[in-house]
A protein has these predicted regions:
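Inter-blade linker and blade-boundary elements of WD-repeat/beta-propeller domains
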Residues: 2-17, 49-70, 98-142, 171-195, ...
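Beta-strand-rich domains and repeat architectures in extracellular enzymes and scaffolds
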Residues: 14-40
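Loop/turn segments within WD40 beta-propeller blades
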Residues: 24-30, 70, 75-81, 125-128, ...
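Conserved strand-to-loop turn within each blade of WD40 beta-propeller repeats
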Residues: 29, 36-39, 47, 85-90, ...
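WD40-repeat beta-propellers
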Residues: 42-47, 91-97, 127, 144, ...
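Aromatic-anchored, glycine/proline-accented short structural segments
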Residues: 155-215
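Loop/turn-rich, solvent-exposed surfaces of beta-rich toroidal or solenoidal domains
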Residues: 199-213, 222-256
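Blade-level signature of beta-propeller repeat domains, shared across WD40, Kelch, NHL, RCC1
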Residues: 278-310
Length: 310
């Protein structure tokens, strides 16, 4: 007897068992959240509706899901009009005004230059400031971060370095070989840099090396955070560093190195943290990773509810 193929609903249910949400980006108005997964999809959530006191379960599901790329969507970034998505060897632009409508298509596709037909880069990080092609890393670049109020960008990669670039000239102006500093080196985990954030003269980065706070002007580590597991994403928030990585926890870290809190989350590992400063209702943080659920925090001490990537 021939076996019939599973229906679309069954196939989707199986797919959701293996979904990882790799990237998030808030809409310019603060009312929506875009989240991207490893099956090439971008989901749009009505964040304002989900935060409403009258919210129902359906308000916490995606209002639209767009098949954006053939491969995983590794990164998202927003402008005042556009949502940019990065996948294997390509960047696509989408109109925020059209994303929730049926039949939405990308506005354009760009393919960064490659040195050979065999080199198809993963677009792991996006920042909206296209001026130069910056070359210097010896391996994959995992993350980039623009410095506020300065024409500079930081990049971290598989080669264990963080590099500071001048966007006026495209020149590298500083090199920090993170894995060579004994304070934060963890050779048993590797030298790769996966997370990177900057604020004023400070930087926090980690991955194989321990998550560490650095003073950029002097190029020296000042605080090594005592987290045993590799961290995948970190950001500054008020007087804290927020981070997530291997393990189902959001870490709240004081700049002194003390752990202010370790908050349980739904994903088995975190890959993306997203602050929503323009959210009209609350100060909101969303966290995502190895799960179809995206946890929403309106208070850093506990999860308020979860959005569902279905």
């Amino acid at each position: 007897m021939a076996l019939s193929s599973p229906s679309g609903g069954v196939r989707r249910a199986r797919q959701l068992l293996h979904v990882s949400v790799l990237a998030q980006s808030a809409s310019p108005c603060g009312r929506f959240l875009a989240a991207a997964n490893d099956f090439g999809e971008i989901a749009i959530f009505g964040l304002s509706a989900a935060l409403s006191a009258e919210a129902k379960e359906e308000n916490r599901r995606a209002v639209a899901v767009v098949r954006a790329h053939n491969g995983p969507v590794y990164s998202l970034a927003s402008t005042e009009r556009l949502l940019l998505s990065g996948s294997d060897g390509e960047i696509r632009a989408w109109s925020w005004a059209e994303l929730g409508r049926k039949g939405c298509r990308e506005l354009w596709t760009r393919r960064p230059p490659c040195r050979s037909s065999l080199e198809v880069p993963e677009i792991n990080g996006l920042e909206v400031n296209q001026r130069h092609e910056l070359r210097g890393h010896q391996d994959l670049v995992h993350v980039v971060a623009l410095r506020e109020q300065l024409p500079q960008v930081l990049s971290g990669g598989e080669d264990g370095t963080v590099r500071l670039w001048d966007l006026r000239t495209g020149a590298q102006v500083q090199l920090i070989e993170v894995h060579k500093y004994q304070e934060c080196s963890r050779p048993q985990l590797g030298k790769w840099i996966r997370c990177l954030a900057t604020e004023s003269d400070w930087m926090v980065c980690g991955g194989g090396p321990a998550l560490t706070l650095w003073h950029l002007r002097s190029g020296t580590p000042t605080t090594v955070f005592g987290l045993a597991q590799p961290q995948h994403h970190a950001l500054f928030h008020q007087d804290l560093v927020l981070s997530g990585g291997v393990g189902p926890a959001l870490h709240l870290l004081q700049l002194s190195g003390d752990v202010r809190g370790k908050v349980p989350v739904t994903p088995a590992a975190l890959r993306s943290l997203c602050l929503h400063p323009r959210s009209p209702e609350h100060q909101v943080l969303t966290v995502a990773g190895n799960s179809p659920k995206i946890d929403v925090f309106t208070n850093l001490g506990y999860r308020a509810f979860s959005l569902s990537f279905t």
